[in-house]
């Protein structure tokens, strides 16, 4: 992310700072300086930091390091992708602000960034879980819906909820990737996700009642949660950064069933830190399990494990670790939690003992010490018996395996002696391997116990893995972690790329897509590529295999392969170090110890010893790979499966290769899921609350890929805002110079159009923003600029507003003081006058005294009357109160009755609850039975397996016995042989003795032989003794084996007996269950029959819904038509108003121009008359001729292209068809080609869609420009016509040149001028005629194209070979070959189209759209030519006016002109007739060709003959073209000669030439037709095709009729438009009149206002006099107000009673609904009562009818309730009216005397009494209606009780039917929504087609107007000629 993003001067920016990382400053200016190191020029910003008070403190910063600050409206934004300036300091600032407010979660596009708060926050309670889980009920996924106003704040629960919702809605696997540094909170967040998923699937205890089935689910979820303490004990350790740091990565799969409930879990683990077992940092600890084991076990248990003490210092692998007390870690409590978790998950006591035994072994191995007797051989210093007993191996074997391991060298075994260092290395490797294998075993056992066994539908995977690591010393482990993070970042980039692409496609926005995943591929290849060149890890694997390899040799190889070969690799300054460029930054690695870490071997001798251990756990852990079935995690992570190749089949695998395999499987799993990303961040290394280390967090943001994601977002349009929000926020920025009325007139109903108006007024570059379908997309920084503009504008508005307010307050004060002064003057004058009259006038004194006495008698009578009336009113009030009491009593009765009904309802509810409990019991019993059945089946299977195993063991034992017996026999045979040999030897001895006695002479020889024989005897005796010992041992073994066999046989017999008894019980139970099953099946069949009946009723409902849909569609169409017509009329009104103003201004300009022009013409008339005539004539005629030739050539070119394209495509298609038909392919080749074509087709369709979109945009732009050009040319023509009229009028009025001078001119110059004029006029007429012909040709071409369209559609309907896919491919091919075809078509001659196949016709159908566009382009050129012609006409009219002044012989010229005009008209008519005949012949010819094309499929056998016909037609076409060119040349020659000859000769020659041309054309066409007929007669009889030709002609006539009807419709529409414009103008005039009238009324009202103000002044004086009287009346008013308050309280009580009754009604309705819902749970009880199945159908119908009746009645009750509410509102209104009347009374009291006030008050009281009586009467009515309602409810209740009793008997069918109906209704709703979408699409298409039709109509009207203007021009010329005659 680079800086300098549109930074301008005086702008607040971020600049880098050493302490604070980034600081705010004000950019004062920019400058350019040279860099000292590079010598290049750099732009530098001069910034004033805001934190410094000194003004002179300025800092120079490179502009690339300057970043703009976001407006304050974007502070603490929840999604950082919404920041309009996306840069590092803005992201840091936003996170810091949120972190200070304990907002630890923030979205960053697809990421959720989570910062560790280091203290407990109330964010994970049950309320929060309910809030996020119930979110989708209120709104549809707040995070996805960006425009929702009820967005919930970012949270880890929101990610979990989104994953869960996607799992249910999409049915796709989900994954949540949680990464970050150690201590950032990865494990805690994964725990929270697990907690959330477990709670929403099982339900919290507060919300869900414990049912028998739910407890199992809760225990299963508890198992998943309890796996965390086990993994933390064995996989977590205390580090410098984190007290509970996970030292391994894990991928937890939480499996769900089809109902969305947790069905199982599976854990896979990665990269366990084995080196920690042997060596730790002094400030860190080993794994928790070692400390928990020593502190948690009893002394006896420790002794059993051969552990002598609890002290950590007594164990060498723990003595160097941190031994301080760690806050938050209690080893004893954690060990208890571990034991409970192991028990909950399902570990047996033996398994737990084995696990602890392995941990103890590792502790004991660490304490082994060595004594080196020699340098080469080591020996143990301490006793090893405890280790060997725990391992279950012989002590001597263990010593030899460690100190003198045996290895195979060739065919011999060789022992190698090890020194103390080497032996220690072997022991360390053993402890590492033991712990790793133990960890794998524990994970396997957890997975085994968490496997539910049933089928799982989908899963949510939680990946908790270490984030990117950059330390001071980075080794092999950091490379593996960073490599995985690099791959994960690439995965994220690809995922983000796909989402961006889909978003832009959905919003219909053009964007050049970039694959961001390729950015990281170089680094990944550098690490993993197998070459060439070979990556880092494969090189390490090669070195690991080679003998005598070292870290230095690996380093030298690495440098030689990668140094200066990759931009991502650098050589380090450190020894044996190198630098890799990752996405997060450069990392320096050292290769020390990499080979040993990659291998980590155990010798074969030790492995074989451990695999044959007597300890079960050790033998299992070191079992060969072929014999053990382990999970993926253990298979991937157990390190030493490569040993003892002779004994096992596995090969040597290094750590890096296993890690790569792990990574591939992980990424494949993630790729098949929908991923969600969580990035955890550690705020500081001190573990303090609310300390925000900016530099540390910035490094983590880089490492976590957050800034990388923001960088990718900047490439597109990161800021997205809804239309309505944008319009409301930035509407104020509309420019002030354009009035608000014009802007409001532009505003429309759709906010999208309003936003478009606003954006155009803001003059933003279109590259900066894009308009989507639902929202606006902005580049980074655009919204910030708009916010600044908005702030500036609001500031200006506020300044103006404050100024106006202040002015208003000052003016108000001044006027108030002036009024005071005036009032005081008036009062002073009145008092002076009063005093003067009292003093001076005695009559006035007499009047003052007598006046009060006169009115006293009248007052007495009035007071009596008033008293009587008051008494009457009091009596009336008492009667009203009595009635009121009576009504209240009735009300209480009704309330009591309602309470009784409620009690009845409660009783019914209790009954329902009992039934529900029964149902639940039945359900639970059925579930338990089913489970027992399943258990029995499983037990049966197990027994059968055990039986088979026992049988196998017996057979093996028999075989062994037989083998032993055979060996015994063999040994006995050998004994017998030895006995026989012994006997023989004895015989030999006896013989020898005889020989000795006989032969004493040979004693020496005999002695020697004797000695030899004695030796042999001894030897034989030894052999005999050994053999006897062997026989004894064999006999002992035989006896022991026989005893063992006997014991085993006894136990087997017992087991067999038990199994047989179990089997018998199972068989009986099985038979019972089968019988029950059959009963259930019978009941099911009955239910299915009833379901069929309900389905028939559903079909009827569907038909009704379809009818409703049709009605809706018609209404929507009518509404859309009305809206569109209204919009058009309003738009046209606006345009007409604008045009009126423009015409007025143009008229004034024309007047001024004309006055100037008149002055100039008077001065330069005589000078330039002759020269202008000659020069202009020549130049204009040449220009017009050139343009005419261009127009003709263009028309020819179009015709050639249309014919040529069709011929070419036909030939290609015929060749293809013949090739396909002639060469049959094998099946295999066809299949291969089919697949290849499929692949090609997919690629072509993608390209096609992109090109179609581009083409649509281009077409829309072209149409817009066309309409603008047409409108501008039309306006220009109107202005020119007005100019001509004005000029004619002025010239007629001002005859400046005298007639005498013109008559007296010499006659010599007249003939030349006459000839010139004649030439000019003839040339102009000829050019006009040619233009008419060309325009008609254009119209003919368009008509031909439309006819082709219609025919192609019909042929398409008839032909079965074509398809939409072929059309798309052919359309694309024709699009790509347009350019080449254009070049070819210019050179190619016209070809006959008689032999075109149908396939090519279909192709032409698609290519016609392209030609339509080209025709539009040529139309535009025609428009331009027409404008030029109009200009020439204007200039010619000027010339004719000039020539009028020099009319010496006008009579002769006018006669000649008239004659010529007549001749020309006659020739034009003839030409028109000829052209019409030619057109008809052309149409006939084209019809014939189309007929032949339609019959091409039947004529495939005669292709060769048709090719010959094509060649003939080509020749004929070339001849026709030549003849046409010759005719054109002849026409030109004739036209030149016509000017020289007489008028009669000209006429004759023209007619003859035209006749000859027509005859030639007719002959050519007749020859062509004859030739074609001959060809066709040779092929097939033409009689077959005559009918088809007639049919096609009829279709053509129909299309022509349709065109005429359309024209008529266009004319009517135009007439309606004109009438509407006239009406609107009339209305406008009426409105203006009304305006004048209202202005007059306002003036009158102002005058009246002045008079009222004077009257008010007089009244004010009276008011002061009457204040005293008012005070006396206040007491009486207070009493009346009290009465009124009492009445109001009565009213309120009655309204409360009404509300209570309404509430009771609503509660009753709700209870009824609940009753209907709870009836669904009565399945099992109803199944027991299936005897009454015969009455089910009738009862269901009656229930439906009654339910419908109840619904209607409830609706009536609701309506009555609404009426009551409305009446209540009327009462409230009356109350307000009474209050107003009171106010009026106060005012009247101030105005009149006391007596008048009393009278008015009495009248008002009478009115009030009458109103009260009316109200009371109405309340009586209401009470009666309520009583009726209560009675009806009682009756309903009784009916409902009856109905419920019936429903309790048989309701199961109805329930199932309703469920199915609901499902079908939901399907129907989906179908309706799809239909609505299709309707919307069709409406859009309809509107687009209407727009097209309107455009065509506009074009037609334009051409009509052009034609009319030309006709008017010709008529004007005629009139001018006539005037010239008159003047002559």
UniProtKB/Swiss-Prot annotation:
Q: Which GO terms describe its molecular function?
A: actin filament binding; ATP binding; microfilament motor activity; myosin II light chain binding; myosin light chain binding
Which keywords describe this protein according to UniProt? Actin-binding, ATP-binding, Coiled coil, Motor protein, Myosin, Nucleotide-binding
A Pfam family of this chain: Myosin_head
Sequence ranges of Polar residues compositional bias = 629-641
- Entry-linked InterPro entries: Kinesin_motor_dom_sf (IPR036961), Myosin_head_motor_dom-like (IPR001609), Myosin_N (IPR004009), P-loop_NTPase (IPR027417)
Entry superkingdom: Eukaryota
Q: What CDD domains does the record point to?
A: MYSc_class_II
Annotated region Disordered: the residues are: 629-657
What does the entry give for GO biological process? mitotic actomyosin contractile ring assembly; mitotic actomyosin contractile ring contraction; mitotic cytokinesis; primary cell septum biogenesis; protein localization to mitotic actomyosin contractile ring; septum digestion after cytokinesis
Q: Where is the Myosin N-terminal SH3-like domain positioned along the sequence?
A: 8-71
So where does ATP get bound? Answer: 180-187
Coiled-coil residue windows: 856-1911
Q: Supply one GO CC term from the record.
A: cellular bud neck
- The IQ domain covers 794-823
Give the residue ranges for region: Actin-binding: 460-529
**Residues of the Myosin motor domain:** 75-791
- What PANTHER family does the annotation carry? MYOSIN, MYOSIN-11
| Miscellaneous comment as given in the Swiss-Prot or TrEMBL entry | Present with 2140 molecules/cell in log phase SD medium.
Q: Which family does it belong to?
A: Belongs to the TRAFAC class myosin-kinesin ATPase superfamily. Myosin family.
Function recorded in the entry = Required for cell division.
Name of the molecule in the record: Myosin-1
Provide the species name. Saccharomyces cerevisiae (strain ATCC 204508 / S288c) (Baker's yeast)
């Amino acid at each position: 992310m680079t800086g300098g993003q549109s930074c301008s001067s005086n702008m607040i920016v971020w600049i880098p700072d050493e302490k604070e990382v980034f600081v705010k400053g004000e950019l004062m200016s920019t400058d350019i300086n040279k860099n000292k190191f590079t010598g290049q020029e750099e732009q530098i910003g001069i910034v004033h930091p805001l934190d410094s008070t000194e003004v002179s403190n300025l800092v120079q910063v490179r502009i690339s390091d300057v970043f703009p600050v976001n407006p304050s409206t974007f502070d603490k934004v929840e999604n950082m992708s919404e920041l309009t300036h996306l840069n590092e300091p803005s992201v840091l600032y936003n996170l810091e602000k949120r972190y200070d407010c304990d907002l630890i979660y923030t979205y960053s596009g697809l990421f959720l960034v989570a910062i560790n708060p280091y203290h407990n926050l109330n964010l994970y309670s049950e309320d929060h879980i309910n809030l996020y889980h119930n979110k989708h009920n209120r709104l549809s996924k707040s995070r996805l819906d960006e425009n929702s106003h009820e967005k919930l704040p970012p949270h880890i629960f929101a990610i979990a909820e989104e994953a869960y919702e996607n799992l249910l809605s999409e049915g796709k696997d989900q994954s949540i990737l949680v990464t970050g540094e150690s201590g950032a909170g990865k494990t805690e967040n994964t725990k929270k996700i697990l907690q959330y998923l477990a709670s929403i699937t099982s339900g919290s205890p507060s919300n869900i009642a414990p049912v028998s089935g739910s407890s199992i689910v809760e225990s299963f979820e508890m198992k998943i949660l309890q796996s965390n303490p086990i993994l933390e004990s064995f996989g977590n350790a205390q580090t410098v950064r984190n007290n509970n740091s996970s030292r391994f990565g894990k991928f937890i799969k939480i499996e769900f069933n089809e109902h969305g409930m947790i069905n199982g879990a599976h854990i896979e683990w990665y990269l366990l830190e084995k080196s920690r077992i042997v060596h730790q940092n002094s400030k860190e600890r080993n794994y928790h399990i070692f400390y928990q084991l020593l502190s948690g076990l009893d002394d006896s248990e420790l002794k059993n494990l051969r552990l002598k003490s609890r002290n950590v210092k007594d164990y060498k692998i723990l003595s160097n670790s941190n031994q301080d007390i760690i806050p938050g870690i209690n080893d004893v409590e954690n060990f208890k939690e571990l034991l409970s978790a192991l028990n909950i998950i399902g570990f047996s006591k033996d398994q737990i003992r084995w696990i602890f035994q392995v941990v103890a072994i590792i502790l004991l191995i660490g304490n082994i010490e060595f004594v080196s007797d020699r340098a080469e051989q080591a020996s143990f210093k301490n006793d090893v018996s405890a280790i060997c007993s725990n391992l279950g191996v012989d002590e001597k074997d263990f010593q030899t395996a460690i100190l003198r391991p045996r290895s195979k060298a060739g065919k011999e075994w060789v022992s190698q002696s090890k020194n103390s260092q080497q032996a220690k290395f072997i022991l360390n490797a053993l402890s590492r391997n033991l712990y790793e294998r133990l960890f794998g075993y524990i994970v396997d056992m957890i997975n085994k116990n968490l496997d539910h066994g049933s089928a799982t539908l989908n899963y949510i995977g939680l990946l908790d893995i270490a984030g990117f690591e950059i330390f001071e010393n980075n080794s092999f482990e950091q490379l593996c972690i960073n490599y995985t993070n690099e791959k994960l970042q690439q995965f994220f980039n690809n995922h983000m790329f796909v989402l961006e692409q889909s978003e832009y496609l959905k919003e219909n926005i053009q964007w050049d897509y970039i694959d961001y995943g390729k950015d990281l591929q170089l680094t990944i290849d550098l690490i993993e590529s197998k070459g060439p060149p070979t990556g880092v890890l494969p090189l390490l694997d090669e070195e690991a295999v080679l003998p005598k390899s070292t870290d230095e040799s690996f380093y030298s190889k690495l440098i030689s392969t990668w140094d200066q070969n990759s931009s991502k690799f650098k050589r380090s300054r450190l020894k044996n170090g190198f630098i890799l460029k990752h996405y997060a930054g450069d990392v320096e690695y050292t290769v020390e110890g990499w080979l040993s870490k990659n291998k980590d071997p155990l010798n074969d001798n030790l492995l074989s010893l451990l695999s044959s251990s007597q300890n079960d756990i050790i033998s299992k852990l070191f079992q060969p790979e072929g014999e053990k079935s382990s999970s993926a995690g253990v298979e991937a992570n157990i390190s030493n499966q490569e040993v003892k190749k002779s004994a096992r089949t596995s090969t040597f695998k290094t750590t890096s290769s296993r890690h790569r395999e792990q990574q591939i499987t992980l990424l494949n799993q993630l790729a098949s899921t929908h991923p969600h990303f969580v990035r955890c961040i550690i705020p500081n290394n001190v573990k303090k609350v609310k300390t925000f280390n900016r530099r540390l967090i910035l490094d983590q943001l880089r490492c976590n890929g957050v800034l990388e994601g923001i960088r990718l977002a900047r490439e597109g349009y990161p800021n997205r805002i809804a239309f309505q929000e944008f319009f409301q926020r930035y509407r104020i920025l509309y420019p002030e110079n354009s009035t608000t009325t014009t802007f409001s007139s532009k505003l429309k109903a759709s906010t999208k159009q309003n936003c478009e108006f606003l954006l155009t007024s803001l003059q933003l570059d279109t590259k900066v923003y894009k308009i989507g379908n639902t929202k606006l997309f902005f580049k980074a920084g655009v919204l910030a600029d708009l916010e600044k503009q908005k702030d500036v504008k609001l500031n200006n508005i506020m300044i103006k507003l404050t100024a106006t307010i202040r002015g208003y307050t000052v003016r108000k004060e001044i006027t108030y003081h002036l009024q005071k002064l005036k009032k005081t003057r008036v009062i002073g004058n009145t008092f002076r006058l009063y005093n003067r009259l009292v003093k001076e006038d005695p009559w006035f004194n007499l009047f003052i005294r007598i006046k009060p006495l006169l009115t006293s008698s009248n007052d007495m009578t009035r007071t009596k009357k008033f008293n009587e009336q008051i008494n009457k009113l009091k009596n009336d009030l008492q009667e009203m109160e009595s009635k009121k009491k009576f009504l209240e009593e009735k009300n209480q009765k009704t309330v009591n009755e309602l309470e009784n009904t409620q009690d009845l309802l409660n009783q019914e509810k209790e009954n329902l609850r009992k039934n529900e409990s029964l149902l639940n019991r039945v359900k639970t019993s059925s579930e338990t039975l089913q489970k027992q059945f399943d258990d029995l089946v499983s037990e049966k299977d197990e027994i059968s397996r055990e039986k088979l195993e026992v049988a196998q063991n017996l057979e093996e034992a028999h075989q062994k016995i037989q083998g032993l017996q055979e060996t015994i026999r063999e040994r006995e045979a050998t004994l017998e042989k030895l006995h026989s040999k012994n006997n023989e030897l004895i015989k030999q001895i006896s013989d020898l003795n005889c020989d000795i006695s006989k032969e004493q002479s040979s004693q020496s020889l005999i002695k020697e032989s004797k000695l030899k024989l004695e030796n042999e005897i001894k030897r034989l005796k030894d052999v005999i003794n050994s053999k006897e010992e062997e026989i004894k041992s064999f006999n002992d073994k035989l006896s022991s084996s026989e005893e063992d066999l006997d014991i085993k046989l006894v136990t087997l017999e017992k087991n067999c007996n038990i199994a047989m008894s179990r089997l018998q019980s199972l068989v009986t139970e099985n038979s019972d269950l089968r019988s029950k099953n059959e009963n259930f099946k019978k009941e099911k069949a009955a239910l299915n029959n009833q379901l069929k009946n309900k389905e028939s009723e559903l079909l009827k409902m569907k038909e009704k819904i379809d009818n409703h849909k049709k009605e809706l569609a018609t209404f929507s169409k009518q509404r859309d038509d009305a809206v569109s017509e209204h919009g058009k009329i309003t738009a046209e009104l606006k345009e007409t108003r604008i045009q009126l103003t423009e015409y007025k201004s143009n008229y004034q300009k024309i007047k001024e121009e004309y006055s100037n022009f008149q002055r100039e013409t008077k001065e330069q008339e005589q000078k330039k008359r002759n020269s202008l005539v000659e020069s202009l004539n020549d130049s204009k005629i040449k220009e017009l001729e050139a343009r005419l030739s261009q127009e003709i050539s263009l028309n020819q070119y179009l015709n050639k292209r249309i014919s040529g394209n069709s011929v070419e495509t036909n030939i290609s298609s015929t060749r293809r068809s013949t090739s396909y038909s002639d060469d049959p392919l094998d099946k295999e080749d066809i299949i291969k080609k089919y697949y290849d074509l499929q692949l090609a087709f997919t690629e072509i369709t993608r390209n096609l869609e992109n090109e179609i979109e581009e083409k649509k945009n281009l077409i829309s732009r072209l149409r817009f420009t066309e309409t603008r050009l047409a409108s501008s040319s039309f306006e220009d023509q109107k202005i020119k016509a007005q100019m001509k009229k004005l000029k004619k009028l002025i010239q007629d009025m001002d005859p400046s040149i005298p007639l005498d001078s013109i008559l007296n001119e010499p006659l010599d110059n007249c003939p030349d001028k006459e000839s010139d004029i004649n030439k000019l006029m003839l040339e102009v007429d000829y050019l006009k005629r040619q233009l008419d012909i060309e325009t008609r040709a254009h119209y003919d071409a368009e008509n031909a194209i439309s006819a082709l369209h219609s025919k192609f559609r019909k042929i398409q309907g008839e032909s079965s070979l074509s398809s939409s896919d072929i059309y798309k491919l052919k359309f694309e091919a024709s699009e790509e070959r347009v350019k080449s075809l254009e070049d070819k078509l210019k050179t190619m001659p016209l070809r006959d189209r008689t032999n075109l196949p149908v396939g090519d016709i279909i192709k032409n159908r698609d290519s016609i759209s392209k030609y339509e566009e080209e025709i539009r382009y040529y139309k535009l050129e025609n428009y331009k030519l027409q404008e030029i012609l109009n200009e020439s006409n204007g200039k010619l009219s000027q010339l004719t006016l000039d020539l009028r002044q020099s009319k010496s012989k006008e009579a002769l010229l006018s006669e000649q002109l008239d004659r010529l005009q007549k001749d020309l008209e006659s020739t034009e008519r003839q030409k028109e007739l000829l052209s019409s005949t030619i057109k008809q012949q052309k149409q006939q010819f084209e019809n014939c060709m189309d007929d032949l094309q339609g019959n091409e499929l039947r004529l495939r056998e005669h292709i060769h003959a048709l090719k010959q016909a094509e060649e003939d037609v080509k020749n004929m076409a070339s001849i026709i073209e030549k003849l046409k060119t010759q005719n054109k040349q002849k026409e030109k020659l004739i036209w030149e000669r016509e000017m020289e000859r007489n008028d009669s000769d000209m006429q004759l020659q023209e007619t003859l030439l035209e006749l000859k041309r027509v005859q030639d054309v007719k002959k050519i066409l007749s020859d062509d037709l004859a030739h074609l007929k001959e060809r066709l007669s040779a092929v097939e009889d033409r009689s077959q095709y005559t009918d088809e030709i007639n049919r096609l002609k009829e279709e053509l006539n129909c299309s022509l009729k349709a065109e005429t009807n359309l024209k008529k419709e266009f004319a009517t529409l135009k007439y309606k438009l004109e009438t509407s414009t006239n009406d609107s103008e009339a209305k406008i005039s009426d409105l203006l009149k009304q305006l004048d009238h209202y202005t007059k009324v306002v003036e009158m009202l102002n005058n009246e206002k002045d008079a009222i103000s004077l009257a008010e002044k007089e009244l004010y004086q009276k008011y002061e006099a009457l204040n005293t009287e008012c005070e006396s009346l206040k007491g009486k008013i207070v009493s009346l107000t009290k009465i009124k308050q009492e009445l109001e309280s009565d009213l309120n009580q009655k309204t409360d009673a009404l509300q209570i009754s309404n509430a009771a009604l609503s509660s009753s309705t709700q209870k009824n609904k609940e009753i209907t819902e709870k009836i669904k749970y009565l399945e099992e009880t109803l199944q027991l009562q299936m005897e009454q199945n015969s009455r089910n159908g009738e009862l269901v119908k009656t229930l439906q009818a009654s339910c419908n009746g109840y619904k209607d009645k409830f609706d009536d009750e609701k309506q009555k309730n609404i009426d009551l509410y409305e009446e209540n509102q009327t009462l409230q209104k009356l109350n307000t009216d009474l209050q107003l009347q009171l106010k009026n009374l106060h005012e009247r009291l101030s105005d009149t005397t006391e007596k008048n006030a009393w009278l008015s008050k009495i009248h008002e009281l009478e009115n009030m009494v009458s109103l009260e009586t009316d109200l009371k009467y109405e309340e009586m009515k209401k009470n009666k209606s309520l009583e009726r309602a209560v009675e009806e409810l009682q009756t309903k209740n009784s009916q409902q009780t009856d109905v419920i009793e019936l429903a309790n008997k048989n309701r199961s069918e109805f329930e199932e039917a309703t469920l199915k109906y609901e499902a079908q209704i939901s399907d129907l709703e989906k179908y309706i929504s799809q239909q609505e979408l299709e309707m919307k699409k069709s409406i859009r298409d309809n509107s687009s087609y209407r727009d097209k039709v309107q455009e065509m109509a506009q074009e037609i009207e334009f051409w009509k107007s052009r034609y009319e203007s030309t006709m008017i021009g010709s008529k004007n010329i005629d009139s001018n000629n006539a005037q010239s005659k008159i003047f002559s």
